[in-house]
Amino acid sequence: MKSPSPVKQSGLILLGLFTLLLRYPITPSPTGTDNFYYISMAKAIISHGQVFWAEEILSLYGLFPGTSPLGATLLASTVTTATGLSIYDYILIHSIFLSLISTFGFFMLSGELTDNYRSRWFAALCFSLAPRFLTFSLWRFSPRFTFIAL
């Protein structure tokens, strides 16, 4: 496999930098109403050391009445405990990292439809600028965003 030309490499770098620029936080705290619910769940897991409200195995997947999926919440509490980051710092890193993964993942996915570099780049740019994706990835912690990004 030959390496891409310098113009294509710089185009991908610019796409990544533009994605980072769009996700730069403009508020002093995370946004979204569900966000604070998931933050309190992660803090409860950290302080108690267990998921005390998940009594059924289906609760972990959000398939039991009154529960929500715990994958992203468990990941957040595990990473903040292991690294010593605050939950807010983790959410910022989480949203930026997943937005980069999903933007470049969409670039690779569009490569299945066309071999034209410009079309792939433009499709990834449009995905990165989509209003719903922007609201999910702007300093927000949501299991839906984790599912969409991956």
How should each PLM-predicted stretch be described?
Residues 1-5:
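Membrane-embedded, hydrophobic transmembrane alpha-helices
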Residues 8-11, 17-149:
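Active-site lumenal/periplasmic loops and adjacent helix-entry segments of GT-C-fold
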